[in-house]
Swiss-Prot record:
The entry's keywords: Calcium, Capsid protein, Clathrin-mediated endocytosis of virus by host, Disulfide bond, Fusion of virus membrane with host endosomal membrane, Fusion of virus membrane with host membrane, Glycoprotein, Host cytoplasm, Host Golgi apparatus, Host membrane, Host mitochondrion, Host-virus interaction, Lipoprotein, Membrane, Metal-binding, Palmitate, Phosphoprotein, RNA-binding, T=4 icosahedral capsid protein, Transmembrane, Transmembrane helix, Viral attachment to host cell, Viral envelope protein, Viral penetration into host cytoplasm, Virion, Virus endocytosis by host, Virus entry into host cell
UniProt organism field: Rubella virus (strain BRDII)
Extent of Basic residues compositional bias: 59-69
A Pfam family hit: Rubella_E2
Record note on modification: Structural polyprotein: Specific enzymatic cleavages in vivo yield mature proteins. Two signal peptidase-mediated cleavages within the polyprotein produce the structural proteins capsid, E2, and E1. The E2 signal peptide remains attached to the C-terminus of the capsid protein after cleavage by the signal peptidase. Another signal peptide at E2 C-terminus directs E1 to the ER, with a similar mechanism. Capsid is phosphorylated on Ser-46 by host. This phosphorylation negatively regulates capsid protein RNA-binding activity. Dephosphorylated by human PP1A.
Biased composition (Pro residues): 93-107
Protein name: Structural polyprotein
Location of Phosphoserine modifications: 46
């Protein structure tokens, strides 16, 4: 965190005396300069630092040299007082008498103004970097393009009244990771990481140094340095803090703006002064705009604005139908009753769930049935040729099971004891022989509708319900306006505050999947503007209006300025002839180097190059969980790397023994002796206390009775075996990770167009060649990247992290957000926990699993000779230190930072009429998977032939154009197999696995009356004008501008006829 150096009283006294003499000399020199007339202030960078520390009125106390505009290394110490005195003034200044000794105090500096230091609000401080931000500390401004040092150490001071006369010196530095600081709004980039220099200070000093404090007591100046003084309390103890400030201010000295000149053209006319006073064109345009807004507001207030069209849905009974409605309300619609849920469908001779049988686009909506009271006819919907059709069945017998009837309208529920239908599929046949193929389910719009369906038969007829109509009304003739529903079609889905709307419903605003409906003038104006002024319309207006306005301005300026004849001649007679393209050819090119195609000239992808701005982020060594051990056919007396040198390797054992959080265990397996000797079991119980008493060791000694001792074989009467294991977290010398930051990344595509080399990027996707212009649809660049170059025992590989790391969010503990060293000698992260060792037999079922985090399993292995055994060691993950380990890098990075989503699109424009070659050979290995006449696109894949683009057709229907090579697309199929595929010439048969629509289809059932309404297709001129009012308005404006332009040109030609056509 920081380094502390206690200062003694004697050192402090000497420093204060030397500083006092220097400051007095500076004050005397400054006072003598103030008496003389001051030269005008310059903007030079060499004098900006001296002037910034002085005020214009009177000999005020000096606030220090802020050094604005200077490009010095602010980590260096200032020059001695003698050099400063000689450089400032050559006149001798009498030295004041020495000040008497004073009690210990902070370094004497000249006070300035007080105030509050602004600082960014980045939340509560969780690390030293955020704590520095919280207390207003800012890094020095650094330009990454210059050859300036990336690190600079500065010194701050910290002392407390409770600590006596001890002053703590805090050294810290800022590291620039290569991004430009954002100093326009007073903030700085979070990528500038804050890192203190030196070892860890005492805990209470760190807590006091990182304590946020916003109040600034004063600004101190010491030579060429500037400090901010703060005092605060931590746990009842008052602390003082002097923070070093940047040498250059955040605002800086900006250059003056260049002079601006405005040229005014006189437009007054002595003959027609009213044109200037009243502004007739402006009045006309304003009136036209108000008229358009009024028309749009009126149209939006009388009818809803719909953005999407609703598909057909079950029809509804008339609102005055049935005697059951006479008891409640004559305008209530008849709602469906509860039916069966789940949807069991009959497919062939079997019943299956709807979710297993339904086509894809039907699963996106609801499916089911309405149960209505009148059973004179039933209705269902069929789907074929990607359209919905209504089917009607007449004379359906009524049910015999009475159930309560429920109606709901305007949040009113009532039950009527009447004869009600049974579940919706009751009374239907289980099989249907001659039904129409291609039937599908119906989709309901409201969550309150029941969902059920079954395969039935019916006549194929088309039907359409009357449309929904609205009106506007007011309560008691006063605002606000309300929307009243005149007729409602339930499948439109209009709701008021979540409740379905019915005829007679009044609501301020209605909402449906089709749009919004309102009578409020403000809402109507917004709806009219949002629906009429779309992005396409705005672009069309700009494209149509801006060129005419520019030409009008050019002609008007040419008529009123000198040199009008030459300007108008250049515009009218010469003009500008844009290049005339004979033909545009479009094709695709794969993204692998070496791919080629015809456009119609040959185009080949020579290579792909990756460019970026690289900033070195340092190098670190990850923690490595390393373990070793040995299986010994006796009981050793010296359990250490030296005592077990014959069984364990010396170098790894020493590295592990000297590692961090060492764990070592010595197991005595079934330790006993026979043939008259005493039992050795108690020699290792409890916890090997007797063994450690005679053989001191730093490892744990544990008995392992019951474990297999077959590894040491050949001694049927006397078997002694022991296992030693050692594990710890170490810094492996051959495992390092180097971090590099890639900013301003760009992908360069190297193309060869008819032998001419060309490079295209996202910024410049064009190639201008002698044969024509080639426009390339280039994928977007990957953005900022972080490269981890991992070197593990000679095997080097790179991993890439997408985007910049969020070091103040979830990535605060990642390796990239830590401070690294150039020589890879620094371990990343906190010290891991101690690993756990475990002895496991070879036949233990535990070996079927993997060791847990921080666990090491050791298993004895039978040797090839007597009294020879080995050891199998399995180490698990790194425990809680995984975030600093290679596993974290693999989990948060990728091996390929950039992969294009598809082929490159090539648009070739040539000045000569050409014909793009088309492939005539049939495609190969074409497979069709899915269904036909079901509304779901089928999957079509295969290989397109060479020789040009393949315009693929399936049974005569166009599917799309594909470059040579493999293609995968989706297409709606209307014909059954077999499928003939072609590229425009010879055809071939494709293999197909499609679903039979007859076995796939089913119907949703609707019981009740059926109302048929045929919509008229005639349209009056007034209706057409109301539907195209925006286009008419835009056309009228363009016509007026064109008329004004022609009049202006005619007037200019009349006055300049002598210059254009002299007699």
């Amino acid at each position: 965190m920081a380094s502390t150096t206690p200062i003694t009283m004697e050192d402090l006294q000497k420093a204060l005396e030397a500083q006092s003499r220097a400051l007095r000399a500076e004050l005397a020199a400054g006072a003598s300069q103030l008496r003389r007339p001051r030269p005008p202030r310059q903007r030079d960078s060499s004098t900006s630092g001296d002037d910034s520390g002085r005020d214009s009125g009177g000999p005020r106390r000096r606030r220090g040299n802020r050094g604005r505009g200077q490009r010095k290394d602010w980590s260096k110490a200032p020059p001695p007082p003698e050099e400063r005195q000689e450089s400032r003034s050559q006149t001798p200044v009498p030295k004041p008498p020495r000040a008497p000794p004073q009690p210990p105090q902070p370094p004497r500096m000249q006070t300035g103004r007080g105030g509050t230091a602004p600082r960014p609000e980045l939340g509560p401080p969780t690390n030293p970097f955020q704590a520095a931000v919280a207390r207003g500390l800012r890094p020095p401004l650094h330009d990454p393009d210059t050859e300036a040092p990336t690190e600079a150490c500065v010194t701050s001071w910290l002392w407390s009244e409770g600590e006596g006369a001890v002053f703590y010196r805090v050294d810290l530095h800022f590291t620039n990771l290569g991004t430009r600081p954002l100093d326009e709004d007073g903030r700085w980039d979070p990528a500038l990481m804050y890192n203190p220099c030196g070892p860890e200070p005492p805990a209470h000093v760190v807590r006091a140094y990182n304590q946020p404090a916003g109040d600034v007591r004063g600004i101190w100046g010491k030579g060429e340095r500037t400090y901010a003084e703060q005092d605060f309390r931590v746990g009842g103890t008052r602390w003082h803090r002097l923070l070093r400030m940047p040498v250059r201010g955040l605002d800086g000295d900006s250059a003056p703006l260049p002079p601006h000149t405005t040229e005014r053209i006189e437009t007054r006319s002595a003959r027609h002064p009213w044109r200037i006073r009243f502004g007739a064109p402006q009045v006309f345009l304003a009136g036209l705009l108000l008229a358009a807004v009024a028309v749009g507001t009126a149209r939006a207030g009388l009818q809803p604005r719909t953005d999407i069209a609703a598909p057909p849905a079950p029809p509804q009974a008339p609102r005055a139908h049935g005697k059951h409605y006479g008891h409640h309300h004559h305008q209530l619609p008849f709602l469906g009753h509860d039916g069966h849920h789940g949807g069991t469908l009959r497919v062939g001779q079997h019943h299956r769930n709807a979710s297993d049988v339904l086509p894809g686009h039907w699963l996106q909506g609801s499916w089911g049935c309405y149960n209505l009271s009148d059973w004179h006819q039933g209705t269902h919907v069929c789907h074929t040729k990607h359209m919905d059709f209504w089917c009607v069945e007449h004379d359906r017998p009524p049910p015999v099971t009475p159930t309560p009837l429920t109606t709901a309208a305007n949040s009113t529920t009532a039950a009527t004891p009447a004869t009600t239908p049974a579940p919706c599929h009751a009374g239907l046949n289980d099989s249907c022989g001659g039904f129409l193929s291609g039937c599908g389910p119906m989709r309901l719009r409201h969550g309150a509708d029941t969902r059920c369906g079954r395969l039935i038969c019916g006549l194929s007829t088309t039907a359409q319900y009357p449309p929904t109509r609205f009106g506007c009304t007011m309560r008691w003739g006063l605002p606000p306006w309300e929307l009243v529903v005149l007729t409602a079609r339930p499948e439109d889905g209009w709701t008021c505050r979540g409740v379905p709307a019915h005829p007679g419903t009044r609501c301020p605003e209605l909402v449906s999947p089709m749009g919004h409906a309102t009578c409020s003038p403000a809402s109507a104006l917004w709806l009219a503007t949002a629906n009429a002024l779309s992005l396409d319309h705005a672009l069309a207006a700009v494209v149509l209006l801006v060129p005419w306005v520019l030409i009008f301005m050019l002609c008007r300026r040419a008529c009123r300025r000198r040199g009008a004849a030459a300007a108008l001649t250049a515009v009218v007679l010469q003009g500008y002839n844009p290049p005339a393209y004979g033909e545009e050819a479009f094709t695709y090119l794969c993204t692998a180097p070496g791919c080629a195609t015809q456009t119609p000239v040959p185009v080949r992808l020579a290579g792909v190059r990756f460019e970026s701005k690289i900033v070195d982020g340092g190098c670190f060594a990850p923690w490595d969980l390393e373990a070793t051990g040995a299986c010994i056919c006796e009981i050793p007396t010296d359990v250490s790397c030296e005592g077990l040198g014959a069984w364990v390797p010396a170098a790894p054992c020493a590295r592990i023994w000297n590692g961090t959080q060492r764990a070592c265990t010595f197991w005595a397996v079934n330790a006993y002796s026979s043939g008259g000797y005493a039992q050795l079991a108690s020699y290792f119980n409890p916890g090997g206390s007797y063994y450690k008493q005679y053989h001191p060791t730093a490892c744990d000694v544990e008995p392992a009775f019951g474990h297999s001792d077959a590894a040491c074989w050949g001694f049927p009467t006397d078997t002694v075996m022991s296992v030693f294991a050692l594990a710890s977290y170490v810094q492996h010398p051959d495992k390092t990770v180097r971090v590099k930051f890639h900013t301003e990344t760009r992908t360069v595509w190297q193309l060869s167009v008819a032998g001419v080399s060309c490079n295209v990027t996202t910024e410049h996707p064009f190639c201008n060649t002698p044969h024509g212009q080639l426009e390339v649809q280039v994928p977007p660049d990957p953005g900022d990247l972080v490269e981890y170059i991992m070197n593990y025992t000679g095997n080097q590989q790179s991993r890439w992290g997408l985007g910049s790391p969020n070091c103040h969010g979830p990535d605060w503990a990642s390796p990239v957000c830590q401070r690294h060293s150039p020589d890879c000698s620094r371990l990343v992260g906190a010290t891991p926990e101690r690993p756990r060792l475990r002895l496991v037999d070879a036949d233990d079922p535990l070996l079927r699993t993997a060791p847990g985090p921080g666990e090491v399993w050791v298993t004895p292995v039978i040797g090839s000779q007597a009294r020879k055994c080995g050891l199998h060691i399995r180490a698990g993950p790194y425990g809680h230190a995984t975030v600093e380990m290679p596993e974290w890098i693999h989990a948060h990075t990728t091996s390929d930072p950039w992969h294009p989503p598809g082929p490159l699109g090539l648009k070739f424009k040539t000045v000569r009429p050409v014909a793009l070659p088309r492939a005539l050979a049939p495609p190969r290995n074409v497979r069709v998977t899915g269904c036909y006449q079901c509304g779901t696109p089928a999957l079509v894949e295969g290989l397109a032939p060479g020789g040009g683009n393949c315009h693929l057709t399936v049974n005569g229907e166009d599917v799309g154009a594909f470059p040579p090579g493999k293609f995968v697309t989706a297409a709606l199929l209307n014909t059954p197999p077999p499928y003939q595929v072609s590229c425009g010439g010879e055809s071939d048969r494709a293999s197909a696995r499609v679903i039979d629509p007859a076995a796939q289809s089913f119907t949703g059932v609707v019981y009740g009356t059926h109302t048929t309404a045929v919509s008229e297709t005639r349209q009056t001129w007034a209706e057409w004008a109301a539907a195209h009012w925006w286009q008419l308005t835009l056309g009228a404006i363009c016509a007026l501008l064109l008329a004004g332009l022609l009049a202006c040109c005619a007037k200019c030609l009349y006055h300049l006829r002598g210059a254009i056509a002299p007699r």
